[in-house]
C-alpha cells in the first residue's frame, strides 16, 4: 500500500512538515505562498502507529539486523556461487580478440565470398615445387579430365583411329597429375590446420617417429623500408639488416627444439650446423646463399650478399616470389616497399609420439617459447628498416598484454571513484565497502547470465569499456540511496525512513537505469558481432547493478544506522578534537554545508554530486506528490545548529551556486530568444554536417596507429596473395643446388671483355690478380694566401713539391680505392683531366678535375688517367662526392659529403655527382667468399619473370557452382586473425553432366551488357585452349566468349580439382559496377545481379546441382558491411530514442515538458556527430555504439532540470500564479537553483572518470572515452542554456504532476506506439520496403 493512500501515514508526514515549518523562520518573512491543493495544517496529528501492508514488511526486513545481515550475506554469496559454477562447470570464458568480430560474417555476402576464397586458397595451397603456375596446373588437369570424358563417350565408336588417339592422350594427361596428390604437400596442411585448432582437426596427420616434420606454427615478419623518399627494400643496408634479424631468430638457444624440419632440408649440407632446421621462408635465401663443395645452396645461411639484381631475376622466375613483396613490384619496376618472411615451427615436439599426442601440452610449450621473441624483435627496427612481427600466438600475446595494461587504467578510475565514495559517505568505510562490493558482485551475476544463460563463449574486446563505465553508473545509484537516506532525518521512525528511501531512490534509479540499459540494449540488434556482444553485456551489467544496489544498500544502511554509525561518529569526533584547534561541530549525518549571509538569505543549497534524483531545497512547506514521490527537502534537525564558520567546500559550492543563478537569469530571462535562435542555427548546421558522416570503409582500428600490431593489421589488407599458404616458396625449396663452375667465364675471357668476376673461387681469377685490378687514387693539395686550394689526383703515392698531403677530417679525402677496369657493378668510368690554364706555376703548376665524359681539349684539359666506380650503392662501398668549381681556376675536388663539394648550384652532371668506391675495409687483402656479389643470371640468364598470380579477387563478380557455403561451427574466434572456416562442397555437382547448361549460362550472362563489360566474361581458367575441347563435349559450348586479357594476364576463372574430379567451378565476369559509387547505389547493382542469376537458374531442371549456384564479389561484402553498419546504428539510435521518449513522457506527463527534452537530445546528438565528422571519423563499430548511448546519456541532465521545474511548481508564489511568463521564468530559475550544482558536479566527475580512457592503447577504448567526455560536456552545456531557455518560453506555467496526468501520458505513449505500428503495416501493404538492421527488407 502506497504512503499517499494511508491517512495515518499522511498525518505522520504532516507532523514532520510542521516541524519543518517551525524550523524555517525565514519563511514567515516572505509572506504567504501557494501551497498547492493541500491545506496547511498548523497542528497535525502526532500519530505513531505502525504502517501496515507490503511496505511495512519491507521496512521491517531492512531495519531488522538479522534480516538485513542475511540479505547482505545473500548479496555476496549468490554472485560468488554463480561465479564458481560458471568457472568450474562451463567452458572457460576467453577474450574475443578476433579482427573478424568487427566484420559482418554471418551475412550471405560474406559467407559466399569467404567460401570461394577458402576454396581458392585450398586449391592454390596445393602447388607443388615443380608446378609453379596454377593456371597451367588447372588447365592441364581439366584438359586431361575432358580427354577422359571424350574417351568414355567414344569408347564404343567405330572409328579406331579416334579411339586410339584418346587412349594415348589419357595416360599422357595422367602423368601431369599434381604431385601433392601422391605426396601431401605440407603447405596444404599448414594452411588448414594452424591457429591452435583442436586435435580432431588433424585428421590428415599420421603417427611418425620423426619430430618437428609438420609445420604447425609460425612467426610472421614484415620489413618496411623507411628513412628516404624511395623506400626501396632492395638495398644493401636494408637487406643486410633483414638477414641479421633472421639469423638472430635462428640463434635463439631453444630454436632447434621447435623449428620445422622437413625432409627436404636434409639435402642442404650447410644447414647441418642448425640440426637441419628449415631457415625462414624468405627472399634472403636468394640474397645470402651458401657455397659448399663447389655448389651454391639457396638457404639464406651465407655471410655475404649476392648480386641484388641477379638474385631478384632468379627469384622472379617463380610466381611464389610475389608472396614476399608488395603489389607494386613488377618486371619493369623491381622495387618493393616491404618484404615478408615466415619462421616456421614444427610438430610433434621432441618426446611426443605424434602431433595428436598431448596436443594441448605441446601447444602450451610452444606458446611459452615463442613469446620470448617479443622483447628481442621489438628492438630490431632501425632508421632504414621497420621490423613488424606477428603470427597467431604473438598476435594473441600482444593483444592480451595490451588489454591487461589498459585494464590497469580502470583501477585508476575505480580508485578515484572509491575515494569519492568514501568522502561523500562522510568517510564511512562500511558504506563505501558495500557500495563498491554491490557493483563488483553485480558484474559476476551479469557475467553468469552472459556466458551461461545466453551461451556466449567470448568476451568482446569492447567489453573492457565496462570496467570504466559500470563503476561510474553503479556509484550513481549508490549515492542516490545514501543521499536519500541522509536527507530523511526528519523521519524519526527508522522503518518509515527506510520505506521512504526505497520508494524515492528506487524510482529515481530505476528511471535512469532503464534509459541507460535501453541505450546499451539497442546495440543488441547490430549485425556486427562486437557491437552486439557489447550491447548485451552492458545492458546486463546495468540491470544487475540496479538490482544489487536496490537490495544491498538498504540493508547496509539499516545495519549502519543501528551499529556502525555511532562507532564512526565517536571515532570521527575523537580525531576532530585532536586534529583541530577550534571546536567545531562535526555534521556526521549531512553531506552538505549550509551557506549563510549571502544575498539569497532565504534559501539553502544542497551540494550533491549526483544527477539521478531531484535535489530540491525549498523553504516553503512541501506537499506530497500524487505520484507517490516524496520531495527531497533540505531541512535541519532540531538538535543541530549551523557551524559558525563555513568550510572551503561550502565557499566553493556557494560560489558555483551564485554563478549558476546569474547564468540562468541571463539565459532564461534576458537572452532566452537569442539562445533559442542560436540553437536553431547550430541545429540546422549540425544536421547538415552530421548527414555527411560516411560509413566506415574498413574494419576499425583496434590499436594505436603507431603500434606494431596495428601497422601489421593495416598491411594485412595490402599484401600480395594474402590468402596463399606459402611455406615452401623460398629458394630452399624452389631452387636445386647450382654448380658454381657454370656461372663463371675464364679469367682470360673476362680480361678480353674488360670485366672481372666479383668473387674469388675455383675457376675465377686469383686474389693477386684481383688486387691488380684495383688501384688507389691519392689526393694532395696546394694552398696559397688569398687563393682557393687546388687538389691533385694521382695514382702515385709520392707527393712532389709544392703539394701537401691531405689529412682526414673536414670532408677531406686523402685517398680512395678504384678499379682500373670494369669489375662487376663497378662500371661507371671517370676520367681525371689535367690543365695548366689560369694558374701560377710557383704555387700550383697544374690543376685537376673529374668528368664522366672525355677531357675538353678546347679549354686546355688533357687526359691524365681513368678508373671505374659504381653508380649505385653496393656491398662494402662508401659514398663520395666530386664536383668542379664554377669559379676560376675551375678546378675539381673529391670530398666525403656536402657542403664541401657543393661548389656549384647546378644539378648533377658530367663534372659533378656521386661515386661509390670500394671501402678501405673491402680491399681484397683476404680472400672473399664465393657468394659475395654472386650473380646467378650472368651467363645464360634466368628466363622470363613469372606472371603475378591473380588469385586475389578484385572487382570481379564470380558465379560459383559446386560450393554450398562455409562452415564456421568449429572455429576458434579468440584469435586476432582467425580461420574463416571450412568449405562445404556440393557433392551432387558434376561438371560434365551440367556442361551444356554451364556453357549456356556463360553466354547468357556475357550477353547482358547492363551487368558485364564487353569482353569481360572469363568463364574458363587460363592456359591451353580448353574451349576447343569443350566443343566436342556439347554443342552449347561452341563460341564460348573469350575474355580480353592483357598479354600474360591470367583469367580469374577457376576450377577446383580433387581426387581426379572437378569439385567446383567459378566463372568470373568484369562487372559494369563502378567501385566509386556509394554503398547504397551499389546495392542496386547487387540486386540486378542476384535477380538475373536467379532467373537463369530457375530455367534449369528440378534437381539440377546448378540451382545451388550463387554469385559473389568482394565489393558486395564491403558494401553490405557499410550498409548494415549504418542501418544497425540508425536502428539502435531510433530504438534508444523511442525508449527514452516514452520514459520521459511518462515521467514528465506533459507535452510542453517533453518537447524541450527532445529538442535538447536532438541538439546534443547532432552536435556530437558533427564534431565526429569534423574530426575525420567514419561511422564504424565504435561510433555505432556511441550513437545509441548518446541518447541515453544525454537525457539525464535535462530530465532532472524538468523534474526540478515540476517540483518548483508545487510551491509557486501567489504573485506569480496569474502571470504565465513570470511563472515559467521563476520555475526555471528555481529548478537551476535546486539541481544546478548537482548536475554540474556530476558532469565534471563523469568527464574526469573518462580521462584514463584517453591513454589506452586499444583505440576503441580511447575513442569511446573521448565520445563520452564530449557528449557529457555538450549535454551539460545544452542543459544550462537551451533547456532553460526553452522551459522559460514554452514550459507550462501552473502545471503540476498528478496521477491523472501520468495515466494520460501512458495512454498517449501506447496510442503513439499503436499508431506507428499501423503506419508500418500500411506502408508494407502499399508495397513499401522497410529496411531491417540485417540488410534485408520487409
Curated annotation (Swiss-Prot):
Membrane topology (UniProt): Multi-pass membrane protein
Gene3D superfamilies named in the record: Multidrug efflux transporter AcrB transmembrane domain
Highest taxon of the lineage: Eukaryota
GO cellular component: cytoplasm; cytoplasmic vesicle membrane; endoplasmic reticulum; endoplasmic reticulum membrane; membrane; nuclear membrane
Positions of region (Disordered): 164-196, 747-768
Keyword set includes Phosphoprotein: no
Listed GO biological process terms: cell differentiation; cholesterol homeostasis; cholesterol metabolic process; negative regulation of neuron differentiation; positive regulation of lipid metabolic process; positive regulation of neural precursor cell proliferation; response to hormone
Location(s) in or outside the cell: Endoplasmic reticulum membrane; Nucleus membrane; Cytoplasmic vesicle membrane
Domain SSD: 401-559
Main location per the UniProt record: endoplasmic reticulum
Residue intervals passing through the bilayer: 68-88, 407-427, 429-449, 453-473, 518-538, 540-560, 673-693, 1129-1149, 1151-1171, 1238-1258, 1267-1287, 1303-1323
Record carries keyword Manganese: no
Stretches assigned to the Lumenal side: 89-406, 450-452, 539, 694-1128, 1172-1237, 1288-1302
Keyword terms of this UniProt record: Cholesterol metabolism, Cytoplasmic vesicle, Differentiation, Endoplasmic reticulum, Lipid metabolism, Membrane, Nucleus, Steroid metabolism, Sterol metabolism, Transmembrane, Transmembrane helix
Cytoplasmic-side positions: 1-67, 428, 474-517, 561-672, 1150, 1259-1266, 1324-1338
Domain notes: The SSD (sterol-sensing) domain is necessary for the increase in cellular cholesterol uptake.
Family per similarity comment: Belongs to the patched family.
Role this protein plays: Plays a role in neuronal proliferation and differentiation. Plays a role in the accumulation of cellular cholesterol. Involved in intracellular lipid droplet formation. May contribute to cholesterol homeostasis in neuronal cells.
Protein name (database record): Protein dispatched homolog 3
Protein source organism: Gallus gallus
Amino acid at each position: 500500500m502506497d504512503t499517499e493512500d494511508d491517512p495515518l501515514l499522511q498525518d505522520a508526514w504532516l507532523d514532520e512538515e510542521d516541524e519543518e515549518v517551525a524550523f524555517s523562520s525565514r519563511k514567515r518573512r516572505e509572506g504567504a505562498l501557494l501551497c498547492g491543493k493541500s491545506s496547511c495544517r498548523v497542528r497535525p496529528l502526532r500519530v505513531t502507529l505502525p504502517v501496515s501492508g507490503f511496505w511495512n514488511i519491507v521496512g521491517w526486513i531492512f531495519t531488522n539486523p538479522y534480516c538485513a545481515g542475511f540479505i547482505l550475506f545473500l548479496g555476496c554469496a549468490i554472485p560468488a556461487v554463480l561465479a564458481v559454477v560458471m568457472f568450474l562447470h562451463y567452458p572457460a570464458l576467453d577474450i574475443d580478440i578476433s579482427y573478424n568480430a568487427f566484420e559482418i560474417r554471418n551475412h550471405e555476402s560474406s559467407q559466399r565470398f569467404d567460401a570461394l576464397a577458402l576454396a581458392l586458397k585450398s586449391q592454390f595451397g596445393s602447388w607443388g615445387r615443380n608446378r609453379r603456375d596454377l593456371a597451367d596446373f588447372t588447365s592441364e588437369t581439366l584438359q586431361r579430365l575432358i580427354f577422359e570424358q571424350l574417351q568414355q563417350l567414344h569408347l564404343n565408336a567405330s572409328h579406331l583411329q579416334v579411339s586410339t588417339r584418346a587412349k594415348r592422350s589419357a595416360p599422357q594427361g595422367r602423368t601431369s597429375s599434381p604431385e601433392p596428390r601422391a605426396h601431401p604437400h605440407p603447405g596444404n596442411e599448414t594452411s588448414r590446420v594452424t591457429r591452435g585448432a583442436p586435435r580432431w582437426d588433424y585428421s590428415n596427420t599420421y603417427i611418425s617417429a620423426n619430430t618437428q616434420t609438420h609445420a604447425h606454427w609460425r612467426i610472421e615478419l614484415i620489413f618496411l623500408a623507411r628513412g628516404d623518399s624511395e623506400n626501396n627494400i632492395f638495398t644493401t643496408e636494408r637487406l643486410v639488416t633483414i638477414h641479421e634479424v633472421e639469423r638472430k631468430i635462428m640463434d635463439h638457444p631453444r630454436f632447434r627444439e621447435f623449428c620445422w624440419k622437413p625432409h627436404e632440408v636434409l639435402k642442404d649440407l650447410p644447414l647441418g650446423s642448425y640440426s637441419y632446421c628449415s631457415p625462414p621462408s624468405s627472399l634472403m635465401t636468394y640474397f645470402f646463399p651458401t657455397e659448399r663443395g663447389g655448389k651454391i645452396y639457396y638457404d639464406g645461411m651465407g655471410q655475404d650478399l649476392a648480386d641484388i639484381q641477379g638474385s631478384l631475376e632468379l627469384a622472379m622466375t617463380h610466381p611464389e616470389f610475389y608472396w614476399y613483396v608488395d603489389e607494386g613490384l613488377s618486371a619493369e619496376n623491381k622495387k618493393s616497399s616491404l618484404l615478408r618472411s615466415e619462421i616456421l615451427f614444427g610438430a610433434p615436439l621432441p618426446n611426443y609420439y605424434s602431433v595428436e599426442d598431448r596436443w594441448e601440452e605441446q601447444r602450451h610449450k610452444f606458446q611459452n617459447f615463442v613469446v620470448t621473441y617479443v622483447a628481442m624483435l621489438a628492438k630490431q627496427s632501425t632508421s632504414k628498416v621497420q621490423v613488424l612481427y606477428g603470427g597467431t600466438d604473438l598476435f594473441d600475446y600482444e593483444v592480451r598484454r595490451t588489454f591487461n595494461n589498459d585494464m590497469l587504467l580502470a583501477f585508476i578510475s575505480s580508485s578515484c571513484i572509491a575515494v569519492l565514495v568514501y568522502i561523500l559517505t562522510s568517510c564511512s568505510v562500511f558504506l563505501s565497502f558495500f557500495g563498491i562490493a554491490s557493483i563488483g558482485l553485480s558484474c559476476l551475476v551479469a557475467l553468469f547470465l552472459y556466458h551461461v544463460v545466453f551461451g556466449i563463449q567470448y568476451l568482446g574486446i569492447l567489453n573492457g569499456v565496462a570496467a570504466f563505465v559500470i563503476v561510474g553508473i553503479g556509484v550513481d545509484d549508490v549515492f542516490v540511496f545514501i543521499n536519500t537516506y541522509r536527507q530523511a532525518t526528519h523521519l524519526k521512525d527508522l522503518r518509515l525512513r527506510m520505506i521512504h528511501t526505497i520508494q524515492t531512490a528506487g524510482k529515481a534509479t530505476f528511471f535512469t537505469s532503464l534509459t541507460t540499459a535501453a541505450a546499451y540494449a539497442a546495440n543488441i540488434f547490430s549485425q556486427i558481432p562486437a557491437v552486439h556482444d557489447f550491447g548485451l553485456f552492458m545492458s546486463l551489467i546495468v540491470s544487475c547493478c540496479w538490482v544489487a544496489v536496490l537490495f544491498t544498500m538498504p540493508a547496509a544502511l539499516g545495519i549502519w544506522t543501528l551499529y556502525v554509525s555511532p562507532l564512526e561518529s565517536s571515532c570521527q569526533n575523537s580525531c576532530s578534537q585532536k586534529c583541530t584547534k577550534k571546536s567545531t561541530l562535526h555534521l556526521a549525518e549531512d553531506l552538505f554545508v549550509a551557506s549563510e549571509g549571502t544575498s539569497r538569505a532565504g534559501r539553502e543549497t544542497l551540494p550533491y554530486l549526483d544527477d539521478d534524483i531531484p535535489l530540491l531545497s525549498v523553504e516553503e512547506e512541501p506537499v506530497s506528490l500524487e505520484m507517490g514521490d516524496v520531495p527531497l527537502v533540505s531541512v535541519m534537525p532540531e538538535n543541530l545548529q549551523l557551524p559558525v564558520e563555513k568550510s572551503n567546500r561550502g565557499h566553493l559550492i556557494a560560489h558555483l551556486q551564485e554563478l549558476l543563478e546569474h547564468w540562468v537569469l541571463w539565459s532564461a530571462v534576458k537572452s532566452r530568444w537569442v539562445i533559442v535562435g542560436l540553437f536553431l542555427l547550430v541545429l540546422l548546421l549540425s544536421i547538415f554536417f552530421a548527414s555527411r558522416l560516411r560509413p566506415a570503409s574498413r574494419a576499425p582500428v583496434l590499436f594505436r596507429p603507431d603500434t606494431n600490431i596495428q601497422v601489421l593489421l593495416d598491411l594485412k589488407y595490402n599484401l600480395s596473395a594474402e590468402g596463399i599458404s606459402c611455406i615452401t616458396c623460398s629458394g630452399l625449396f624452389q631452387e636445386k643446388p647450382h654448380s658454381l663452375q657454370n656461372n663463371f667465364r675464364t679469367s682470360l675471357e673476362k680480361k678480353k671483355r674488360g670485366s672481372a668476376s666479383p668473387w674469388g673461387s675455383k675457376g675465377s681469377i686469383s686474389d693477386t690478380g684481383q688486387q691488380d685490378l684495383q688501384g688507389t687514387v691519392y689526393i694532395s693539395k696546394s694552398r696559397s694566401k688569398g687563393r682557393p686550394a687546388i687538389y691533385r689526383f694521382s695514382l702515385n703515392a709520392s707527393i712532389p713539391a709544392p703539394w701537401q698531403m691531405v689529412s682526414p677530417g673536414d670532408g677531406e679525402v686523402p685517398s680512395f680505392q678504384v678499379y682500373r677496369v670494369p669489375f662487376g657493378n663497378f662500371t661507371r668510368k671517370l676520367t681525371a683531366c689535367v690543365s695548366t690554364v689560369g694558374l701560377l706555376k710557383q704555387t700550383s703548376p697544374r690543376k685537376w678535375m673529374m668528368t664522366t665524359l672525355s677531357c675538353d681539349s678546347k679549354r686546355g684539359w688533357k687526359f691524365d688517367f681513368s678508373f671505374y666506380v659504381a653508380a649505385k650503392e653496393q656491398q662494402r662501398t662508401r659514398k663520395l662526392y666530386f664536383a668542379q668549381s664554377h669559379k676560376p681556376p675551375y678546378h675539381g675536388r673529391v670530398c666525403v659529403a656536402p657542403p664541401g663539394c657543393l661548389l656549384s648550384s647546378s644539378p648533377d652532371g658530367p663534372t659533378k655527382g656521386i661515386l661509390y668506391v670500394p671501402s678501405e675495409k673491402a680491399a681484397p687483402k683476404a680472400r672473399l667468399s664465393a657468394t659475395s656479389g654472386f650473380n646467378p643470371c650472368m651467363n645464360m640468364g634466368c628466363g622470363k619473370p613469372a606472371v603475378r598470380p591473380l588469385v586475389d579477387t578484385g572487382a570481379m563478380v564470380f558465379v560459383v557452382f559446386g560450393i554450398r557455403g562455409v562452415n564456421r561451427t568449429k572455429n576458434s574466434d579468440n584469435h586476432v586473425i582467425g580461420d574463416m572456416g571450412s568449405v562445404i562442397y556440393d557433392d551432387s555437382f558434376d561438371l560434365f553432366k551440367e556442361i551444356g547448361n554451364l556453357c549456356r549460362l556463360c553466354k547468357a550472362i556475357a550477353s547482358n551488357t547492363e551487368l558485364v563489360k564487353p569482353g569481360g566474361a572469363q568463364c574458363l581458367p587460363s592456359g591451353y585452349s580448353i574451349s576447343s575441347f569443350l566443343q566436342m563435349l556439347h554443342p552449347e559450348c561452341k563460341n564460348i566468349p573469350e575474355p580480353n586479357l592483357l598479354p600474360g594476364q591470367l583469367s580469374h576463372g577457376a576450377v577446383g580439382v580433387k581426387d581426379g574430379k572437378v569439385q567446383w567451378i567459378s566463372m568470373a565476369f568484369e562487372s559494369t559496377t563502378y567501385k566509386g559509387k556509394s554503398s547504397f547505389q551499389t546495392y542496386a547493382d547487387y540486386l540486378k545481379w542476384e535477380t538475373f542469376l536467379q532467373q537463369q537458374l530457375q530455367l534449369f531442371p528440378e534437381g539440377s546441382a546448378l540451382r545451388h549456384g550463387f554469385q559473389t564479389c568482394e565489393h558486395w561484402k564491403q558494401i553490405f558491411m557499410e550498409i548494415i553498419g549504418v542501418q544497425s546504428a540508425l536502428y539502435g539510435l531510433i530504438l534508444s530514442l523511442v525508449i527514452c521518449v516514452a520514459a520521459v513522457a511518462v515521467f514528465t506527463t506533459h507535452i510542453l515538458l517533453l518537447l524541450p527534452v527532445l529538442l535538447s537530445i536532438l541538439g546534443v546528438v547532432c552536435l556530437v556527430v558533427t564534431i565526429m565528422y569534423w574530426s575525420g571519423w567514419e561511422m564504424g563499430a565504435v561510433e555505432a555504439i556511441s550513437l545509441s548511448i548518446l541518447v541515453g546519456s544525454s537525457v539525464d541532465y535535462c530530465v532532472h532540470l524538468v523534474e526540478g521545474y515540476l517540483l518548483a511548481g508545487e510551491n509557486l508564489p501567489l504573485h506569480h500564479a496569474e502571470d504565465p511568463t513570470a511563472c515559467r521564468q521563476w520555475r526555471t530559475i528555481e529548478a537551476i537553483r535546486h539541481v544546478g550544482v548537482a548536475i554540474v558536479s556530476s558532469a565534471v566527475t563523469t568527464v574526469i572518470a573518462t580521462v584514463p580512457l584517453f591513454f589506452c592503447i586499444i583505440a576503441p577504448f580511447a575513442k569511446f572515452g573521448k565520445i563520452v567526455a564530449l557528449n557529457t560536456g555538450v549535454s551539460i552545456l545544452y542543459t544550462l542554456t537551451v533547456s532553460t531557455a526553452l522551459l522559460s518560453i514554452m514550459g507550462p506555467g501552473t502545471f503540476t504532476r498528478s496521477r491523472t496526468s501520468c495515466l494520460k501520458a501512458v495512454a498517449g505513449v501506447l496510442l503513439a506506439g499503436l499508431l506507428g505500428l499501423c503506419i508500418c503495416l500500411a506502408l508494407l501493404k502499399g508495397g513499401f520496403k522497410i529496411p531491417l538492421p540485417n540488410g534485408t527488407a520487409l
